[in-house]
Amino acid sequence: MLTMVGLTPAEDRSEIAFFDVETTIPFRVGQGYAILEFGSILVCPKKLVELKNYSVLVRPANLNLITPRSVKCNGIKREDVESALTFADIADTVYDILHGRIWAGHNILKFDCPRIREAFAEIGRDPPEPKGTIDSLALLTQRFGRRAGDMKMATLATYFGLGNQTHRSLDDVRMNFEVLKYCATVLFLESSLPDELIENSVTTTTPETSSRRRRTIKKSPLQSPTDQQTGENMTTIPILSFVSSAEAQTDPFDMSTLRNEIAPEVLQSDVPMEEEQNQQSETVASEGTGDQEGFMELDKISVSSIRATHVPLYDGSQTMKLQLFLGDRPLQLHCPRLKVRFGINGKFMDKAGRRRLNFVIDLYPSLCNVLQECDSAAQTISVDSGSGSDWNPLVIPMKGFLNCPTARIHIPTELNGDIDRYAAEIHQKEFSGATATQKLISSNPKAEEIESLLNPRTVLDAFLSLEPYDYQQRAGIRLVARKLVIH
C-alpha cells in the first residue's frame, strides 16, 4: 500500500487533513467529474506545522474526459496520467489519510468532499468520514469579510503576497494552509485592537464592519459551544474554533441534523458571493409589477416548451446573456401559496454596502419540475457555449425535512434615479367575504420591513423572474422576486 511521507503506524488522528482534488471538467449535462490528482497535508492543530504530505496523479477510467478545458484549468494532460494509478489503487491511502480526522480545504463542502464520496461510491466502497470540517471559503467569507476581493484562493494568495496559484493539489493545499494562517493572524490582532485602529487600517464597505467583525470573532455559528461558553479551546488550540461539526457537514446538502436556527447560515454559504454585481439585467427602470401580465401560471406551462438561448444584453448590445423562454415568451413565474422555510438572510453585503436579502421556500412538485427543467436547459446551453464554471443547482435537496426540496428567492436592488431601493413590491392579501384583494404595503420596502414580513411558515404568492448568471467560475439561475403577496 502507498504510504504518506512521514506517516507513522500509531497516531491519534488529531491532525487536520488539508486536502484538494484536481478533476476533469464535465462537458455535457449529467456527466460527472473524474479525479486526476489528490493531494493532502496533515497539520498539527497546536503548532500549525505540516507533519506529513501525500500527492498522487490518478488515471480516470475514461481518458477522453480530459479535455482542453480541463488541461487549461489544472495543466494535467492525458499523457501525464496514462500510466498513473487508478483511484481504486490509492483508495486505501486516501481513506487512511482522511477518515476520522478534521478535513480542511477551500470550498471543500461544495466540491472536494462530494468528489471523494463519488470516487469511493464508483469503486463500491464506503467513503471516509470526517469528525469535523473547516471550509476556508465559507469561513473566511464570514470572518475575514470582503477586503480581499472575491475570496478565491488565487485572490487571497495575491492579497497576502504568497505568489500565483498553480491549481495542482499539493501546491494548492499548502497555499490554502498559509492563507488560513495569515487570515487567522489578522483576525487575532484585530480582536485585540481598539475599534478606531481597525477602522483606520481596514477597507470597509459599511460603518458597521468593524463592530460586526469583532462580534463575529467573539461568537460565531462555526465556533463550538464550548468555545463560546469558556473560550478555553480558542486559547489552547485557536484553529479548532474554526471547525464545523461532522454531523452537520457529512453531506453538504443534508440538513437533517441541523437546528432550524442555524440552517439559514449553511444555506447562505452556497450563494455565489457577487454574481448579482455583474448581472446588468437587474438594474432596470422603476416599474410597477402590480399587474400580473407576463407571469405564467404553473399549470399552463409545458416543460417541453422551456428553452434557453443567448440574447443581447440590451438592444444593440454585442454582449450576450442567457435567457429562459417558454416558447417565444420570456419565462416568468406566478407561484401561488409558497411556504417560507427560512426567513430573510441578509448577513452579506454588496459592493455598495447594502444588505443582500434572500429567503428559502419549500417547493411543491409542479414548481420543482419547472425549475429543474429550467436548470437543465440553461446548463446545457452554458456548457455548449464553452463555459467551464461550476453549476449551482436551482433546486436544493433537503433530506430529513420530509425530503421536501427548496429554492432560494432573492430580493433585488434597483436604481430609480439616484436612489437605490429594494425593488420587490410587497402586497398583503385581504379577504372580504369570498372576495380576495391585494393591498400594496410598499413598492420600495426597507430591509427591516421585508425581514419582519418573511418569517418561517409564512405563506405567500410570488411573481418571479429567472436570471441566469455566469461569474467567477460559478454559474446557475437566480430566482428574483418582482412581487410578493403575503397571505
UniProtKB/Swiss-Prot annotation:
Descriptive protein name: Protein NEN2
Region annotation (Disordered) ranges: 200-233, 269-291
Active-site feature positions: H167 (proton donor/acceptor)
Cell location: Cytoplasm; Nucleus
Family matches, as InterPro entries: Exonuclease_RNaseT/DNA_pol3, RNaseH-like_sf, RNaseH_sf
UniProt keyword terms in alphabetical order: Cytoplasm, Exonuclease, Hydrolase, Magnesium, Metal-binding, Nuclease, Nucleus
Organism field: Arabidopsis thaliana (Mouse-ear cress)
Primary subcellular site in the record, as a coarse category: cytoplasm
Tissue specificity comment: Expressed in the sieve elements and phloem pole pericycle cells.
CDD domains in the record: DEDDh
UniProt KW Glycoprotein keyword: no
Role, per record: Probable exonuclease involved in enuclation of sieve elements.
Required co-factors: Mg(2+)
EC number: 3.1.11.-
Description of what induces expression: Regulated both transcriptionally and post-translationally by the transcription factors NAC045 and NAC086.
Keyword Nuclease belongs to the record: yes
Biased composition (Polar residues): 221-233
Binding-site positions, Mg(2+) 2: D20
Disulfide cross-links: none
Domain Exonuclease: residue ranges: 18-179
Residues that, per the record, bind Mg(2+) 1: D20, E22, D172
One Gene Ontology CC term in the entry: nucleus
MF GO annotations: exonuclease activity; metal ion binding; nucleic acid binding
